[in-house]
Regions:
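A Zn2+-metalloprotease active-site environment signal
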Residues: 1-201
Length: 201
């Protein structure tokens, strides 16, 4: 069940974008890198089942290795993740996966479930679309970091592989980078002397 319209998603993504930037130290200001990431993202987005011009790619200025997407086509990778990628195909694999989440509207599904929990089915019948977006924004800016279901991750992988292939990248790069992220997460956990708390992309 998705309670948000396409316009609600764009509005919500724009609202949360400002919160994301503040939380992660802002956008990375190395224009050459941000232009490069945007170029790779647009190359992939041209093959997605979603208007390519609605995607917005941002490199966040943090060494944390992570990537995620917001409703409305907002996609984020950290400079730590870009540094970990060994080649363009691995970076493309991450971006393609996040584009898959946007195309399948997984964030909108997650926000809708949260709204159902918070407001109750009876109240939802009287809520307008614009009110829905406003209420969801008030739930806080942490929903985007919560994990997707296994089925959603599988769907994002499937779509991502499709976009990688159509754009001329090696689809195997997605799996190789996932393995690299796992190794990095285990190493960081050992340095901290605790369990691995790294969020999966």
């Amino acid at each position: 069940l998705i309670l948000l319209s396409a316009e609600d998603e764009r509005r919500l993504g724009a609202q949360e974008h400002l919160k994301i930037s503040r939380q992660f130290g802002g956008a990375y200001d190395l224009k050459r890198l941000t232009d490069y990431v945007t170029g790779v993202g647009r190359k992939l987005a041209a093959h997605a089942e979603y208007p390519a011009d609605r995607f917005r790619f941002t490199v966040l200025d943090t060494p944390i290795v992570n990537a995620f997407a917001l409703p409305g086509g907002y996609i984020y990778v950290t400079r730590g993740l870009v540094a970990l990628a060994g080649n363009e195909a691995e970076l493309a694999g991450v971006l393609a996966h996040e584009i898959g989440h946007v195309t399948a509207r997984h964030s909108a599904q997650r926000y809708s479930r949260q709204m159902l929990t918070g407001l109750g089915a009876g109240v939802l019948g009287a809520v307008t679309r614009s009110r829905a977006a406003r209420d969801l924004a008030n739930l806080g800016g942490t929903l985007y970091l919560r994990g997707y279901s296994r089925d959603q991750e599988f769907q994002a992988d499937t779509l991502g592989i499709r976009y990688l292939t159509r754009a001329g990248y090696d689809p195997g790069a997605m799996a190789s980078f996932l393995a690299k992220m796992g190794a990095n997460a285990r190493f960081q956990a050992k340095l901290r002397g605790g369990a691995d708390n790294t969020a999966a992309y």
